[in-house]
Amino acid sequence: LTLTITPMRWLTGINQLINYRRLIGLFAFFYGSLHFTTFFFFDHQFDFAAMWEDVRLRPYITAGFVAFVLMVPLALTSTTGWIRRLGGRKWNLLHRLIYITACAAVLHYYWKVSIKLPPTNPRNYAILVAVLLAFRLWRNFARKRASEV
């Protein structure tokens, strides 16, 4: 959902949407934290060794774990103070991890659901993420091309 804010702003011209991006990203981290805590508590009773074994052996758990771990620095550095401390360029570079995070989260969902059910819903999320990333790549390519002319 966070990845949709910038393309929606570009397409609609409603620049106020950017004000909600941080909040939506933090909600995503909150959801991921609850999801991880539930997994860690109910599936492993806070046993680190058992959890790590699960992360190591089950690909969908590995993908979910990667997505969660990558979200931690994004949430921690989401404040204006961290933007100033890191500098805009380094902060932007760090926050590009959201693209890998989104792909890992979709992969986690796809692998988990496809074990028991046809993967229709995860496929829709994968298509959405692919379209959003393609749109960003196309826009960046068009911008670079326009600046060269």
Give, region by region, the residue ranges found by the protein language model.
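Membrane-embedded alpha-helical bundles that constitute the cytochrome b-like, heme-associated redox core
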Residues: 1-149
